[in-house]
């Protein structure tokens, strides 16, 4: 579980894999994958970092931990595999995208095309037991993903950080470089979306910022499959 990303994250994160917290996390995960049903597949844990190299990151959308239902999680925050029903929070994201930018609501929740455009779809915890939300909280992943955020904060090219909900907003303390843009609101979950997520226009705000720094805006439209 010391990963190879096959991009610039390899050099940036290589020291993390030697640290005591990560070695303990690795031991824990080896046992969990042997004895429990864990999501995502161990081959998908680091997909966010594999698909979106450090130098290419334009936007970060922080999630909490992976979906814990069968066949949902595949290493990207909020995204589900093709053929899997779109979860409620992602449905609300698509509703906001529709009202914000006029994107049609797709028949799937597969967000890989966002990752390929420079959106780092990063959960703060990268694994979970099936049916047990937050079951891998406090095992070491937070230290690892905080390091990812710290490295992004150091970058000299601006990044948009999208922080939805208390867990994500708590990471704002790591984003100290004033060149970056922070967009935050309540979570798109049905429990909170009507209290400030709907109407917050995060997608057009992101594109407006990217255009202002002479970057290509994101094509947010997820195509039907």
Swiss-Prot record:
Question: What are this entry's molecular-function GO terms?
Answer: uracil DNA N-glycosylase activity
Which key words tag this protein in UniProt?
Cytoplasm, DNA damage, DNA repair, Hydrolase
Say which enzyme class the record assigns.
Answer: hydrolase
Cross-referenced SUPFAM superfamilies: Uracil-DNA glycosylase-like (SSF52141)
Instruction: Spell out the PROSITE patterns in the cross-references.
Output: U_DNA_GLYCOSYLASE (PS00130)
- Source organism, top-level taxon: Bacteria
Gene3D superfamilies attached here? Uracil-DNA glycosylase-like domain
Reaction it catalyzes:
Hydrolyzes single-stranded DNA or mismatched double-stranded DNA and polynucleotides, releasing free uracil
Q: What EC numbers are recorded for this enzyme?
A: 3.2.2.27
Where can this protein be found? Cytoplasm
Keyword DNA damage among UniProt keywords:
yes
> Its family?
Belongs to the uracil-DNA glycosylase (UDG) superfamily. UNG family.
Question: What role does it play?
Answer: Excises uracil residues from the DNA which can arise as a result of misincorporation of dUMP residues by DNA polymerase or due to deamination of cytosine.
The name of this protein is: Uracil-DNA glycosylase
* Organism from which the protein derives: Clostridium perfringens (strain ATCC 13124 / DSM 756 / JCM 1290 / NCIMB 6125 / NCTC 8237 / Type A)
Cite the source lineage.
Bacteria, Bacillati, Bacillota, Clostridia, Eubacteriales
